[in-house]
Structure formats: C-alpha cells, structure tokens
Amino acid sequence: MHGNIADQAERLEKFKSQFVFDPQYSLWHGVERECFLVTGDDTYVPRAREALTHIHRNAWSRKHRGRTLSVDTRKCVGFELSAVQLETRTPPHQLHDTADYLRLIDINLRSSLGEVGLYARYDEVAPKSLPLDVYPDPRYLRITASMPREVLSAACRITGTHHHVGMPDHETALRVYNAAAKECRKLMQLGDNSHGERLRIYGIVKPDYMPRPYDSWMDFCDDAHESGFADDVRSNWRFIRITRYGTIEFRMFGSTENIDRIYSWVRLCHAICKDALP
C-alpha cells in the first residue's frame, strides 16, 4: 500500500470506478473474434478501413421468434491495431444464443467482405512478411509510435478469440477472477492450435501475460499501479482480466473458423465462472 489511509481509500475508489457492473448481465456472454484480411490469392492486405466503411453502410438482419431484427454492424465489426485485421463482436447474450450469433456474424461478414474482394482468414499466426500498417486510430498510433519493429511485427502477426462473461458487482468479479486465473494454463493449452507459436509471439509483445491472484481490490489496485495500467485498465493485457465493462475476459484462445470449438470454450468458461459464484 502507498500513502496514508485517506489517500489509499481515494486511490482505490478512483481505480474501482473504472469498472462498471450491471447485475442483469451476470453470466451473460460476449465473444470477440479477430481475423486477417486476404485477397482471393491469399495475399494479406491492410484494407481494414476500406472494409469497415463498406460493412458499416448497411445493417445486418437476424431472425428471432418469427421476426426479422436489425443488427448494427458498427457494434459488431471493428478495427484492431493491425490494418490487416478486423474484429467481430457478438452483442451481450445468454449462453444458448452463442452459436447462433457467431454463425450470424460469420455469414454476414463473409458476404460483406466478398463484395469488396476480401476474405476473412482465421490463422493464429501470420507470416513474417505480413504488412505492418497500423490502423489510423489515435490510440493505436500513440501506442505504436515508439514501438520496436520486432514488437510491432509480433503484435500484428497474431489473432485470437476473446470471451467475456458478465459479473454482477466488484466483489463477485474478483472472486470469480481468482478462480478463473487458476485455470489459465489449462485454457491456454485448449485454445492453442499453433504448437505454442502464437503464445511465444504474444510474449514478445507482453511478457507479463499470466493473470495474478489478488487478495482484495486494494491488492489489485496496487498491482495495477506497479504494472502501469491503473489509469487505463484497457492496458492490462494479461490472458484473464476484469474489464471496465464489468466482465471477466478470457484472452488466451487462438483464432479459428470452427464455431463449435469456440462454443466449447465458451461453455467451459461459463462453467468455471458459475462454479465460482458465491
């Protein structure tokens, strides 16, 4: 701990205020999938901005209980650090809807990309020859401004599947996080399809990727200050983390086209979180 008791309390509350929880979404899910953009001859191309401009012109539709619902593509498809990558995101949903949302986004993404001569490729690791263009987002441009080329290459060459599980409040989130952290190495093995190459490359970008257990939110706050993410919790890049959106995020899984495989990861993470609830 640092400073007097009043300073510690203020410091802790400032840190905790970054995390917003909504009890109605407890044990709800969200899945993020990263992919590379390639042309018909499998050439990796930095065309994320062009692709997003095209995708965001139209809404996608979803059939639900006999009705056709509109899906906002701006919420479902976004950019990554690499201009060769896109990220898709499901809306918050319950476990039984996961596979349907993944298929809905997959079908629509492939169709939209095909209209501009692009394809989604779900490699865990791209070749060393991958273009290193950074998406023109101020945050990513700032992050990469002084980044060594080796680190930039590593950051651009790997993609993953990230899974969020909603939590009702701060204390429950910390309890579930600690339980999940114990399972991290097992989940890393389950989510690897590159014989450890993606994990090795990720270690070049962020060597400190293993989640740490915390005795309390003050313990978490102290570590955040020491590790440099206290003022922006998005900068915590460990494989399991509590997010500002009030979720436990599992970040160790690689990219894959196989939706059934992703759903198996989601079910396992759901069980880990549910079993840890008080």
Protein language model regions, located:
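Terminal catalytic/cofactor-binding subdomain
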Residues: 1-149, 157, 246, 260-278
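Loop-rich catalytic cores of soluble enzymes, especially ATP-dependent carboxylate-amine ligases
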Residues: 138, 142-151, 155-260
